Amino acid sequence: MEYFNVGKIVNTQGLQGEMRVLSVSDFTEERFQKGARLALFDDKDRFVQEVEIASHRKHKQFDIIKFKGMYHINAIEQFKGCSLKIAKEHQGKLAEGEFYYHQIIGLEVYEKDQLVGQIKEILQPGANDVWVVKRQSKRDLLLPYIPSVVLGVDIEKGRVDVEIMEGLDDED
């Protein structure tokens, strides 16, 4: 079965079985809603167990979750550092022009059919995502995911076409 990362348990929260999660999903309300089923993986990416979300709330930059049947700190202490993942078949369908992070990371980036590099990470600093492009012999390039920069994404071909606006590449 194929799984995709949606968050990491960074600590416990109080004594009632709540955990602090750093989410890496654009769909936190959906991923962590009551009744959602996720898989736990340890720090060596080994499957630990499947869990069901009992509750979810936001607190500062964290998502605070509780698993069904685990209502005390002693039951969840062991999960600190674990990754939360969703099975591929539980991912919902996206609208045209929307993508999951795992579909974008690893794609090759081209400007006018010239290879720029490969997307290695996606940042969420504010209004728009920023795609981090790893380049040969140059510093990483930060590309905002906006229509004037990202001209096209072809998941099947593993390709992103961009127009690097003046000022985005400080190594030119």
Swiss-Prot record:
Alphabetically ordered keywords of this record: Chaperone, Cytoplasm, Ribosome biogenesis, rRNA processing
InterPro entries per record: PRC-brl_dom, PRC_barrel-like_sf, RimM, RimM_N, RimM_N_sf, Transl_B-barrel_sf
Gene Ontology molecular functions: ribosome binding
GO biological process: ribosomal small subunit biogenesis; rRNA processing
Entry superkingdom: Bacteria
Residue ranges of every copy of the PRC barrel domain listed in the record: 95-168
Location(s), subcellular: Cytoplasm
HAMAP family in the record: Ribosome_mat_RimM
Protein name: Ribosome maturation factor RimM
The species this protein was found in: Streptococcus equi subsp. zooepidemicus (strain H70)
Name of encoding gene: rimM
